[in-house]
Structure formats: C-alpha cells, structure tokens
Amino acid sequence: MANDDVTRQIEAFKRHLEDMKLRADSAQYEFVTTVCNEVERTAKTLMRDTETNPDVTYGTKGHHPSMPGSAPAVDTGALRQSITHSVEVDSSGNVTGYVGSIIRNPPYGAYLEFGTSKMKPRPWLSTAVIKCRSFMQQVSDRIYKRIAK
C-alpha cells in the first residue's frame, strides 16, 4: 500500500515537472517575442523623435542630421522602415531574438550605430535596448509570476 502511494506521488511529481517545462518553454518564447517587439518599436520611435542639428543640411531636400550621440534623424525613412525582428527556436528549444535593419549593402544601420571615420555614431539600436531594460524586467516579472504558480 505504501509503495503505491509513493509511486503515485512520484508520477504526479513527474507530470508537474513536465508541465512546468512546457510553461517555461512557452514563457521563454513569449518573453523574447515581447521584448523584440518593444525594442523594434522603441528604435523606430527614437528616430522619429530625435533632436536634429538645424545648422547643418545635406542633400537636395535639406536634411538636418541628428546630433552626434543621438539616434539618426529620418531622411528617406528607409532605415526606419527596414527595422524588424525575428524569433527563432533551435532544435534544443532555445529561443533567440534578433532586432535590426534588413539593409545589408551598404550596412547603413551599422554605419549610423557605430559611426565611420567621417561621422560620429548615431546609436539607435543600443539606445533602444537600454531604454527597454525596465520593460524587460517588468515582462520577466509578470511571466515568472504566472508560471511559478
């Protein structure tokens, strides 16, 4: 009789662990997806709301660039429109999120993010990630509370 009770308890505990793993896997995907969405949105907003230098103009449209150290000001909108994210799950169940520009040739987003020999950096992605830190913690706390039940 005692062995049957122990066996039932062990089986119940195994089911509980399997359920926790499923909830944790789902929570990991939810966290990465939610954070990537927010970083993408924040990067685009930074470009829209950045301070420009009224004393400098470029091009035929009279584009005013952003101040060095600020997110890049929108000129054509190509970079802003190219910012996207993706979330991948590998064969082991690990979830990885990517946020960035899909423009690769030339790597315009990287030139602005890190600067060039002739232009100081206009960080947009790293600034977006930094601005999202408290959001990331809030999402993590919310998900943890839900799955820890």
Locate each region found by the language model:
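Short, Lys/Arg-rich flexible segments
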Residues: 1-149
